Structure formats: C-alpha cells, structure tokens
Amino acid sequence: MIVAFSVAPTVVGDESAEMSEAVAEAVRVVRASGSPNETNSMFTIIEGEWDEVFAVIKEATDAVRAVSPRTSLVIKADIREGVTGQITQKVDSVNRYLEENK
C-alpha cells in the first residue's frame, strides 16, 4: 500500500521556525523507518504493509505532537495487497504516456 500523509502543528509559538522544525522531525521518523518514501511540498508518501505504515505515521504524528498540543493529520491511501514499487511506478507510467504522445 501507498499512503500520502501530511502532519503539522496547528499551534506553535514562532510559526515559521517551529512548524518547519516539527515537520522535519516527522520526516526524520519516516526516513528512519527504512520504508520506501518521498517527501514533497504537500505530503510525505510511504509504501509498505498496513501495520508498518500506520505505525510510522503514528510515530511521525507523535513527533509533531511533542511540540504542539493541537496537530493536523491528513491521510490518503492506495491499498493494493501484494503490490510494491508503486511510488515510482505510477509516476513512471504517466511520464511514459507523456513521452509517447508529444
């Protein structure tokens, strides 16, 4: 399964510094998990089995909650049992169609 999620503090003292720092701690948790992942300006995407992915999301959320009593969490999942490599394969497929139809 692939899960795209965004976690951020909604209450911080210095908005610019603390929000980025809290999000960085969440991303650090995801990267340390060893699961395939990517981070962009809106979401962090992680791939793996249900229990392992949601354990990482919980740990990342807890990292943000450590600096904010109120936290926003958005989750979107593509659940396809037994399918791996979708983080890159989906994008590669779209790019292939774009290249073929120039």
Regions found by a protein language model. Name each.
Residues 1-102:
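Charge-rich, low-complexity N-terminal segments
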